[in-house]
């Protein structure tokens, strides 16, 4: 009988014993094991890094009953199972581009995954204005492979519908539908964080702009009704581990079937936030790299998507002349739209980005926002 046969929220002491029990294939040196909470560990879950004196290590991630960002948010603890299974599928579609998952535990709502502490969290690195020349190539490959290969263009339609059923979390979709695709435009639940000097601008340009509301409503309903491909679901620079020679995408708990452009738009928006931060310090070299990376990410996505489509398409009607171009035009349109909603929600919504909030000069922050 194990004390981990019933759910409870672990602390750093519990997690060492838990790791020994659940990750037994790793030859741990028990006497030298330690655990800490890493500095960057997201808004929802509880994350621990466990290691020993012989070079073995693992990340343990547990879903709590409440989200870390707000006790009012109580998404299902099943999100840990969801993330683990999505990561394993993404590893099949884009090998080596996500952390390896050692196990997931549906009782403790926890998983063990590859320790990527030899990588930087990309947002942290870009706050230091570090540059990563291969990022555009890596992230475009990841998006093309995970999005296209999980779509009806390639998959057997019955198999794809099974994945739609399997990878749906009403609680997490509800967070996206409210925090990203509604509240930044009306503050309906009084959770927005608006920078005081920008209140008049936000009221005029976001809260009172009915034409904008119409376009966001279209994007929201596309997100809710178009199960186009399996998304990472929260593909920002805080969900990317990076080194000069490699990129790994993590935090896939918001993964669901929705429009491809939601993922691609998130990447572009978060690069723009990095550009804003660089602009605030007049770092021309960094800003130039970010702009080049945005262009290369889009261009490489277009190029690779077209090539992979031709190689992998199985649906006969998707081979009809002109269909590929029509289909891809929709992805690019959605990319632009969802880049906009990400820029809005990360500026005035519940979860602001440090790229902007750490700009100390008021005029420069106003300009960035």
Regions found by a protein language model. Give the residues of each.
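Active-site activation/catalytic loop segments of kinase-like enzymes and analogous catalytic loops
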Residues: 85, 261-313, 339-356
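Active-site acidic catalytic loop and adjacent metal/ATP-binding pocket
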Residues: 37-54, 58-60, 214-264
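Conserved NTP-binding catalytic cores of kinases and kinase-like/nucleotidyltransferase enzymes
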Residues: 1-109, 244
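ATP-dependent phospho-/nucleotidyl transfer catalytic cores
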Residues: 72, 123-142, 148-232, 243
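Conserved short submotifs of the Hanks-type protein kinase catalytic core
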Residues: 108-120
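Short, flexible/disordered intra-domain loops and linkers
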Residues: 68-78, 127, 279-288, 359-364
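ATP/Mg2+ or Mg2+-diphosphate-binding catalytic cores
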Residues: 321-369
């Amino acid at each position: 009988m194990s004390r981990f046969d019933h759910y409870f929220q672990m602390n750093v002491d519990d997690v060492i014993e838990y790791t020994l029990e659940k990750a037994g294939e790793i030859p741990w040196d028990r006497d030298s094991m330690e655990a800490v909470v890493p500095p960057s560990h997201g808004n929802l879950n509880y994350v621990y890094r466990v290691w020993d004196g012989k070079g073995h290590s693992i990340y343990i991630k547990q879903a709590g009953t409440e989200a870390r960002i707000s006790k009012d948010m109580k998404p299902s603890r099943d999100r840990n199972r969801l993330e683990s299974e999505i990561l394993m599928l993404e590893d099949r579609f884009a090998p080596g581009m996500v952390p390896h998952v050692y196990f997931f535990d549906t009782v403790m709502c926890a998983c063990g995954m590859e320790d990527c502490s030899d990588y930087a969290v990309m947002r942290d690195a870009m706050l230091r204005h570090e540059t990563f020349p291969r990022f555009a190539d890596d992230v475009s490959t990841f998006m093309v492979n995970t999005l296209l290969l999980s779509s009806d263009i390639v998959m057997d339609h019955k198999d794809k519908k099974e994945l739609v059923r399997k990878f749906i979390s009403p609680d997490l979709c509800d967070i996206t539908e409210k925090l990203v695709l509604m509240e930044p435009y009306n503050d309906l639940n009084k959770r927005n964080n608006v920078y005081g000097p920008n209140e008049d601008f936000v009221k005029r340009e976001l809260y009172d702009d009915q034409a904008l509301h119409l376009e966001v409503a279209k994007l929201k309903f596309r997100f809710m009704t178009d199960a186009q491909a399996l998304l990472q679901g929260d593909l920002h620079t805080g969900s990317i581990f990076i080194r000069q020679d490699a990129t790994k995408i993590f935090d896939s708990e918001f993964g669901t079937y929705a429009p491809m452009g939601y993922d691609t738009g998130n990447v572009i928006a978060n690069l723009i936030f990095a550009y804003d931060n660089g602009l605030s310090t007049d770092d021309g070299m960094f800003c130039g790299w970010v702009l080049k990376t945005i262009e290369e990410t889009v261009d490489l996505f277009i190029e690779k998507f077209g090539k992979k489509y031709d190689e992998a398409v199985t649906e006969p009607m998707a081979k009809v002349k002109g269909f590929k171009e029509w289909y891809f035009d929709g992805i690019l349109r959605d990319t632009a739209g969802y880049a906009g909603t990400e820029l809005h929600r990360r500026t005035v919504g519940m979860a602001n980005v440090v790229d902007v909030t750490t700009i100390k000069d008021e005029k420069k922050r106003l300009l960035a926002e």
